[in-house]
Amino acid sequence: MASKKNGPRVSEGRFGTGVVNRREFLGAAAASTASLLAQPAYEWGGPVLDIHLHLRQDPESNFAHITGSGVTKAVLLARVQAVDQAKVLAERHPGRFVWFVSADVTKPENDALLTKAVRSGALGLGEIKNQVECDGPEMKRMYALAADLNVPIQIHFGDVPQAAGNAVFNGGFKRFDKMLQAFPKTNFIAHADTFWANVSSDYAYNTAYPSGPIRPGGISDKWLSDYPHLWADMSANSCNNFLQRDPEFTAGFLVRHQDKLMFGCDCSCSDGRGGGNTNPSPRLHGKCIARETLAAVQRMSTPEVFRKIRWENGAKLLRITSQA
């Protein structure tokens, strides 16, 4: 019988003889657990970049939303007054957030604040949503600033007043191609109802969320093909409505513009699973827009196209190299 003075217990097996003590075993187990935790479990088959998540009154609820919806990294949309909150949240959750910045474009003095924010880490200007014309002097100034700073600009196009807001934002979308021509060095990210409604050539500007089959030849579809510096933000009810209207057309659209489309949510639910979402659309009430849109795009596209939309296109435009 071996004496206890002879040292740790020896274990023998078919892999030979080794010395294992309790401290080493616990250390190895902890290392194994850490390794497993470090390996991301992707709910959507790979990393997801959400390019449209507004900074919330309780910033930690942003983290709850991306965790619940299976998003890997999100672009926080912060007003210039809330830049410090966006920075703190990004630092608190390394690798999970980047951020854009916006301000009232009718005040030229805000240009300096936007410039300062970009130089301190903002990856883009947005969401720009003001009651101005998309080809007016205020927005022309923003387009030039985005080009000078070498960051994209994310624009809310809303020509039809909605009951909740009763206002027009960046109006005159039919004329926006002139801006695309005038600012070839600016990367534009188009968002909201007027952009997505205009995928159909018969849009009558009588509702923010048209229904029914899509008639080919819409200006949004055409401009995505014609202008390499125009990208599309697939967030909110506006894009989700487009996805549901005409699945056969939409499948072709996703293939046609697979290098220009970027997933976003613009969702107000609390937990990434629909909690607290009071969206007036019966289609989305009580649901997470992020989940609904990701599921629709995944269902209508190939794995390769879905990969581009959920991650690669946004990462390329924003020059994001890390998935964490």
PLM region spans:
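H/E-rich (His + Asp/Glu) clusters that bind or coordinate divalent metals
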Residues: 2-7, 12-15, 57-60, 195-324
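An N-terminally biased module of ancient metal coordination in phosphate/nucleic-acid-related enzymes
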Residues: 25-26, 39-95
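Hydrophobic faces of well-ordered beta-strands that scaffold small-molecule active sites
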Residues: 49-53, 74-76, 99-101, 125-126, ...
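Active-site gating/metal-coordination segments in enzymes
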Residues: 80-171, 231, 236
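Helix C-cap/helix->beta junction micro-motif
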Residues: 93, 148-149, 183-184, 226-227, ...
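Charged helix-capping and loop-helix junction motifs
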Residues: 136-143, 168-174, 213-217, 245-249
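Active-site cradle of extracellular carbohydrate-active enzymes
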Residues: 166, 171-183, 188-201, 219
